[in-house]
């Protein structure tokens, strides 16, 4: 459950380390984002050698949340951290690698590139 002002780890090699959510995309009344939802983020910390700088605004997709996500079979899945993957304006990935597991719900939300690059899909 991600909302405005939530800090997330970055799960790709774009150069950003931590981002802060500044808007949840998907309607005027949408307050919370879950796995597979698109958000607008501001980069709060970045590695010096990366191609993205601190203060940059970018779109991202949520890949892990601490709040559990209910699946259709009745099971729940939750992760140890909140994490996102940065996107370019045309919904292409900014990085070329993804670290850590991602949720299977990304496949249903049409983020196949994220699923294919992830080392583990839960």
Curated annotation (Swiss-Prot):
PROSITE patterns xrefs: RIBOSOMAL_L14 (PS00049)
GO molecular function, one term: structural constituent of ribosome
Keywords of the record: Ribonucleoprotein, Ribosomal protein, RNA-binding, rRNA-binding
GO annotation, biological process: translation
Pfam family membership, one: Ribosomal_L14
PANTHER family per record: 50S/60S RIBOSOMAL PROTEIN L14/L23 (PTHR11761), LARGE RIBOSOMAL SUBUNIT PROTEIN UL14M (PTHR11761:SF3)
Subunit structure as annotated in this protein's UniProt entry: Part of the 50S ribosomal subunit. Forms a cluster with proteins L3 and L19. In the 70S ribosome, L14 and L19 interact and together make contacts with the 16S rRNA in bridges B5 and B8.
NCBIfam families membership: rplN_bact
The protein, known as: Large ribosomal subunit protein uL14
Lineage, top ranks: Bacteria, Pseudomonadati, Bacteroidota, Cytophagia, Cytophagales
């Amino acid at each position: 459950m991600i909302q405005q002002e939530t800090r997330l780890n970055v799960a790709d090699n774009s150069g950003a380390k931590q981002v802060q959510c500044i808007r949840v995309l998907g309607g005027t009344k949408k307050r919370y984002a879950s796995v597979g939802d698109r958000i607008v983020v501001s980069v709060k910390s970045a590695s010096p050698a990366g191609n993205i700088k601190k203060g940059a605004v970018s779109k991202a997709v949520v890949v892990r949340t601490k709040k559990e996500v209910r699946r259709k079979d009745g099971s729940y899945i939750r992760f140890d951290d909140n994490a996102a993957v940065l996107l370019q304006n045309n919904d292409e990935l900014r990085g070329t690698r993804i670290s850590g597991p991602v949720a299977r719900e990304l496949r249903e939300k049409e983020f196949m590139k994220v699923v294919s690059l992830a080392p583990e899909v839960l």
